[in-house]
Amino acid sequence: MTTPDLEDKSFDSFGLDDRLLSGLAACDMKQPTLIQNTTIPLALDKGVDITAKAVTGSGKTVAYLLPIFELMLRAEKEKRDIQTALIVVPTRELCEQVSKVITKLTQFCPHLKSLNVTQQLGDDVISSLLEEKPSIIVGTPSRLLKYAKEMDCSKVGYLVIDEADLLLSYGYKEDLIELSEMLPKTKHTFIMSATLNKESDLMKQQFCRSTVASVAVTAAEEERKLLQYYVKCSERDKFLLAYVMFKLQLVKGKTIVFVNEIDRCYRLRLFLEQFGIKACVLNSELPIASRLHIVEQFNKGVFNLLICTDEANKLAEASKSASKQTKEVSRAHEYSSTRGLDFMNVAFVLNFDLPLSSRAYVHRVGRTARANKAGTALSFVVPADQWGKDKVAKLDTAKRDEKVLKKIIKNQESQNMEIKPYSFDMKQVEGFRYRMDDAFRAVTTVGVREARVKEIKTELLNSERLARHFDENPDDLKALRHDKELHTSKVQAHMKRVPDYLLGRKGKLDPNVFVPFRKDDNKIHKKYTKKKKGGDPLKFKKRK
């Protein structure tokens, strides 16, 4: 079935338990989104299995959690056994995020306990927690499969497969099938994703019962306030445009920059440091505790510029090439900055490196324009005739940028969305090139490697040795910043300032707009000083 035209409803109209309504109110959730309006009644009233496709940020997590909680509470009232819910997600970060949402929604239902099996706890600790029979268990397929033998799988009544397409692309298909064979055939299944393909249809046949409701909510139906642009430029000009955009503050609000390789994220960060532009990096090499803390600080506004490595691109390449190291692929299985993570109030997304597919693009730009807020996405595209001319700035995946762009445009048009070309006034930008070249030369390959090692060592120290200290002294945690300058490349102080001659006339203050505290040339004071000139300062002259 497709999404029907629905009138605005409130959560009260679903007949939810008062405790859940109180949890929603505490989370400041007043109005259900379109996907929630569609999914919740189907799950509660008709009891069918559901496959749902909706854009990121549309509220899919709450859409499957609420009906599960409501059915559990109804079973409690009817004095029936509460069946266990398994929530399968692709990454550890997403496990943590889903667990937090569960805690908030069930804060008035203390008997509904949840467990995240991807926590950094020992196997014995996880096993002991499973013996307490939590109502909701969250984890990645491999972790859930590991502990499934210790659980009473016959009690599992609900199965959620979140970010289904990503689970398949990460090679979890066999784990999912093995897990499904251990679960009852009568389980209530939810398959959720921002993009569903033919492989997802196979999952429907594998996991769902005979009665399945398919829900699809397009970006146009969600009325997303997303503006999308692309700029065709050379590989070196990417750095020039990024410098101009961030140094002149042409971009306002929180920004996420996506690159395709870990070395690229450190090169870009060191490059921006040359101009005094602070940024933080997020990639799979960092410890899980650091990654979660970086996302938390970003959401709190501690820093506004985040450079993310899109590991999904690496996995796509690795699946095509048997020579790729399996260690890198397995590490990236547990991480993806483009999927599921709830980056809050992101105003701008910059695809510094274009993704390898239109599907990956959808997930990237989905970080902004969430929850009915406005957002902008800009993508740098390297023309085929410009690729490979700069050995240092060269990126292998950029060779296919123009082909990928055509697929992205076609995909967006099918969603009734538009991506427009954008052109910078290169005559004005050209004046900044010599400073960009100086900064680019200062960031060497050795400097990038040293920055990468230094960052990992620092984050490991923060994650392991200081974890207990921060628990006892939470105020000290405020001093921990992830966007501090790395200083592995020599930073020239003058590069942090933008000379007036580069700004041109537009960069200078307009005397018709600028209002000083004192008027020019002290004209008022001169008026009186002229009258007093030549007079006796000791002589008092009475006014007429």
Curated annotation (Swiss-Prot):
ATP-binding RNA helicase involved in the biogenesis of 60S ribosomal subunits and is required for the normal formation of 25S and 5.8S rRNAs. It is an enzyme of class 3 (hydrolase). One of its GO terms (biological process) is maturation of LSU-rRNA from tricistronic rRNA transcript (SSU-rRNA, 5.8S rRNA, LSU-rRNA). The Q motif is unique to and characteristic of the DEAD box family of RNA helicases and controls ATP binding and hydrolysis. ATP binds at residues 54-61. The keyword RNA-binding applies. Residues 41-214 form the Helicase ATP-binding domain. A motif (Q motif) lies at residues 9-37. Belongs to the DEAD box helicase family. DDX56/DBP9 subfamily. Gene3D superfamilies: P-loop containing nucleotide triphosphate hydrolases. Keywords: ATP-binding, Helicase, Hydrolase, Nucleotide-binding, Nucleus, Ribosome biogenesis, RNA-binding, rRNA processing. One of its GO terms (cellular component) is nucleolus. This is ATP-dependent RNA helicase DBP9. The gene is DBP9. SUPFAM superfamilies: P-loop containing nucleoside triphosphate hydrolases (SSF52540). Its EC number is 3.6.4.13. Its main location: nucleus. Pfam families: DEAD, Helicase_C. Residues 225-430 form the Helicase C-terminal domain. Residues 534-544 have a biased composition (Basic and acidic residues). The keyword Glycoprotein does not apply. One of its GO terms (molecular function) is ATP hydrolysis activity. It catalyses: ATP + H2O = ADP + phosphate + H(+). A motif (DEAD box) lies at residues 162-165. It is found in: Nucleus, Nucleolus. Residues 525-544 are annotated as: Disordered.
